[in-house]
Regions:
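Active-site and channel-lining beta-strand-loop segments
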Residues: 1-13
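PLP-dependent aminotransferase-class I/II
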Residues: 108-148
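Residues in well-ordered beta-strands of folded domains
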Residues: 4, 105, 142
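Sequence-level motif detector for i,i+2 pairs with an aromatic at +2
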Residues: 9, 102, 135-138
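Short beta-strand-to-turn element immediately C-terminal to the catalytic PLP-Schiff-base lysine
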Residues: 4-5, 23-24, 118-122
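Active-site metal-binding loops of divalent metal-dependent hydrolases
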Residues: 1, 79, 109
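A short helix-loop
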Residues: 101-103, 110
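Glycine-rich loop-to-alpha-helix module at the N-terminal edge of alpha/beta enzyme cores
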Residues: 10-98, 105
Length: 148
C-alpha cells in the first residue's frame, strides 16, 4: 500500500500508522464488517452498556487468555489502555497492603501514549519536557539493544 504526500510523492506504508493500524488500508472485508455493524448499532459505551459484538469479543478474549484471566475491560485506545494498566498496578499493590510500591520503571525512547500518566512513562524527553511539572515520577532505563 502506498501513501502519497501533498507533493504527490508516494511512500510504501510499512509502519501501519502509529504502529496500531494493523488491518491495512481499504480491506473490503473489514469495510463490510464495519458497515454491517454500523447499520445495527454504531456504538454503545461499554462502561454502562453492552452490545452483541462486545460480548462476543469478550468471550473470545477470555477463551484465548490464560485461565487466570476471566474478565475483559474495554477502553478507547492505546493511551487509555496503558493508563488503565498503571492504575491497575497501583490498585493491586494497595489491596495487597503494599502502598509503598508505587515506582514505575519504563524504557528510554519508548512511546506509551498521550495522557499525562503515560506521557510520564514515555521515554522521549522532548515529548515530556513542557509537561514535567504535571507528571508522576518514573525512572527510565536503556532501551533494548540486541547487538550489544
Amino acid at each position: 500500500m502506498y501513501l502519497t504526500d501533498a507533493k504527490g510523492k508516494e511512500y510504501i506504508d510499512a509502519s501501519g500508522g502509529a504502529a496500531v493500524s494493523c488491518l491495512g488500508h481499504g480491506d473490503s472485508d473489514v469495510i463490510k464488517a464495519i458497515q454491517v455493524q454500523a447499520d445495527k448499532l454504531a456504538f454503545a459505551h461499554t462502561g454502562f452498556l453492552s452490545s452483541e459484538p462486545a460480548e462476543q469479543l469478550a468471550d473470545l478474549l477470555v477463551e484465548k487468555a490464560p485461565s487466570q484471566f476471566g474478565k475483559v475491560f474495554y477502553v478507547s485506545g492505546g493511551s487509555e489502555a496503558v493508563e488503565s494498566a498503571l492504575k491497575l498496578a497501583r490498585q493491586y499493590h494497595l489491596e495487597n497492603g503494599e502502598p509503598q510500591r508505587r515506582h514505575i520503571i519504563a524504557r528510554q525512547q519508548s512511546f506509551h501514549g498521550n495522557t499525562l500518566g503515560v506521557l510520564a512513562a514515555g521515554g522521549n524527553q522532548w515529548r515530556r519536557k513542557q509537561f514535567e511539572p504535571l507528571l508522576i515520577e518514573v525512572s527510565h532505563i536503556s532501551p533494548c539493544f540486541a547487538y550489544r
